[in-house]
Amino acid sequence: MLYDTFMRKMDRILAGLMARGQGLLLTVQSVGGGTEYIHTDDLMSVEVFGHKLVYHTKGGDREGYGTIAAQAAELEKLSFLQPSRSAIVNPRFIEAVKGDTVRVGGVEIPISRLRKKEFLSELNRWICK
Protein backbone atom coordinates (compact mmCIF):
# COMPACT_ATOMS: atom_id res chain seq x y z
CA MET A 1 0.00 0.00 0.00
CA LEU A 2 1.38 3.38 -0.95
CA TYR A 3 1.95 5.93 1.78
CA ASP A 4 -0.46 8.45 0.20
CA THR A 5 -3.22 5.85 0.00
CA PHE A 6 -2.58 4.84 3.59
CA MET A 7 -2.72 8.47 4.78
CA ARG A 8 -6.01 9.10 2.94
CA LYS A 9 -7.57 6.02 4.55
CA MET A 10 -6.17 6.98 7.96
CA ASP A 11 -7.56 10.52 7.62
CA ARG A 12 -11.03 9.10 6.84
CA ILE A 13 -10.86 6.77 9.84
CA LEU A 14 -9.73 9.57 12.13
CA ALA A 15 -12.43 11.91 10.82
CA GLY A 16 -15.02 9.27 11.68
CA LEU A 17 -13.62 8.89 15.18
CA MET A 18 -13.64 12.66 15.65
CA ALA A 19 -17.29 12.89 14.66
CA ARG A 20 -18.26 10.44 17.41
CA GLY A 21 -16.60 12.21 20.36
CA GLN A 22 -16.94 15.69 21.81
CA GLY A 23 -13.25 16.43 21.43
CA LEU A 24 -11.02 16.85 18.47
CA LEU A 25 -7.96 15.08 17.13
CA LEU A 26 -4.98 17.40 16.85
CA THR A 27 -2.49 16.66 14.12
CA VAL A 28 1.03 17.08 15.47
CA GLN A 29 4.19 17.19 13.35
CA SER A 30 6.40 15.18 15.69
CA VAL A 31 10.02 16.08 16.39
CA GLY A 32 11.17 12.59 15.40
CA GLY A 33 9.50 12.98 12.02
CA GLY A 34 6.09 11.85 10.95
CA THR A 35 2.66 12.75 12.20
CA GLU A 36 1.00 12.00 15.53
CA TYR A 37 -2.58 12.51 16.61
CA ILE A 38 -3.58 13.69 20.08
CA HIS A 39 -7.19 13.64 21.25
CA THR A 40 -8.11 16.87 23.01
CA ASP A 41 -9.90 14.93 25.77
CA ASP A 42 -6.43 13.69 26.82
CA LEU A 43 -4.64 17.00 26.33
CA MET A 44 -3.90 18.89 29.56
CA SER A 45 -1.77 21.74 28.22
CA VAL A 46 0.53 22.90 25.43
CA GLU A 47 3.70 24.90 26.06
CA VAL A 48 6.24 26.35 23.68
CA PHE A 49 9.96 25.93 24.37
CA GLY A 50 12.16 27.46 21.70
CA HIS A 51 10.84 26.19 18.38
CA LYS A 52 9.13 23.11 19.84
CA LEU A 53 5.67 22.62 21.27
CA VAL A 54 5.36 20.30 24.27
CA TYR A 55 1.97 18.62 24.56
CA HIS A 56 1.27 17.49 28.14
CA THR A 57 -1.22 14.62 27.90
CA LYS A 58 -2.64 12.07 30.33
CA GLY A 59 -0.35 9.51 28.67
CA GLY A 60 2.83 11.59 28.96
CA ASP A 61 4.53 14.45 27.16
CA ARG A 62 4.94 14.66 23.39
CA GLU A 63 7.00 17.12 21.38
CA GLY A 64 6.14 18.58 18.03
CA TYR A 65 6.67 21.50 15.71
CA GLY A 66 4.23 24.30 15.01
CA THR A 67 3.10 27.59 16.44
CA ILE A 68 1.24 28.20 19.66
CA ALA A 69 -0.99 30.69 17.81
CA ALA A 70 -2.19 28.01 15.38
CA GLN A 71 -2.88 25.59 18.25
CA ALA A 72 -4.68 28.31 20.25
CA ALA A 73 -6.96 29.10 17.30
CA GLU A 74 -7.83 25.42 16.90
CA LEU A 75 -8.38 24.78 20.62
CA GLU A 76 -10.24 27.99 21.43
CA LYS A 77 -13.55 26.55 20.21
CA LEU A 78 -13.16 23.74 22.77
CA SER A 79 -12.85 26.23 25.67
CA PHE A 80 -9.09 25.88 26.11
CA LEU A 81 -7.62 28.92 27.85
CA GLN A 82 -4.40 30.82 27.21
CA PRO A 83 -2.73 32.12 30.40
CA SER A 84 0.24 33.50 28.46
CA ARG A 85 1.59 33.77 24.92
CA SER A 86 3.60 30.60 25.49
CA ALA A 87 0.94 28.23 26.86
CA ILE A 88 -2.59 26.86 26.39
CA VAL A 89 -4.42 24.94 29.12
CA ASN A 90 -7.44 22.65 29.23
CA PRO A 91 -9.65 24.01 32.05
CA ARG A 92 -10.85 20.48 32.88
CA PHE A 93 -7.36 19.67 34.20
CA ILE A 94 -6.68 22.86 36.19
CA GLU A 95 -5.76 21.84 39.74
CA ALA A 96 -5.02 25.26 41.24
CA VAL A 97 -4.56 28.93 40.46
CA LYS A 98 -2.16 30.55 42.89
CA GLY A 99 -0.75 34.03 42.43
CA ASP A 100 0.67 34.25 38.94
CA THR A 101 0.66 30.53 38.14
CA VAL A 102 -1.85 27.89 37.18
CA ARG A 103 -1.15 24.21 37.96
CA VAL A 104 -2.30 21.78 35.29
CA GLY A 105 -1.47 18.09 35.60
CA GLY A 106 1.28 18.86 38.13
CA VAL A 107 2.94 21.41 35.82
CA GLU A 108 3.16 25.04 37.00
CA ILE A 109 2.40 27.41 34.11
CA PRO A 110 2.90 31.17 34.52
CA ILE A 111 0.00 33.56 33.95
CA SER A 112 1.17 36.74 32.25
CA ARG A 113 0.30 40.04 33.91
CA LEU A 114 -1.35 41.30 30.73
CA ARG A 115 -3.62 38.25 30.39
CA LYS A 116 -4.34 37.52 34.06
CA LYS A 117 -7.65 39.40 34.29
CA GLU A 118 -8.94 37.95 31.00
CA PHE A 119 -7.72 34.44 31.90
CA LEU A 120 -9.43 34.47 35.31
CA SER A 121 -12.61 35.86 33.77
CA GLU A 122 -12.68 33.12 31.10
CA LEU A 123 -11.95 30.47 33.73
CA ASN A 124 -14.80 31.78 35.87
CA ARG A 125 -17.15 31.72 32.85
CA TRP A 126 -16.10 28.14 32.10
CA ILE A 127 -16.70 27.06 35.73
CA CYS A 128 -20.17 28.67 35.77
CA LYS A 129 -21.29 26.89 32.56
Regions picked out by a protein language model, each given a short descriptive name:
Residues 119-129:
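C-terminal output/interaction extensions
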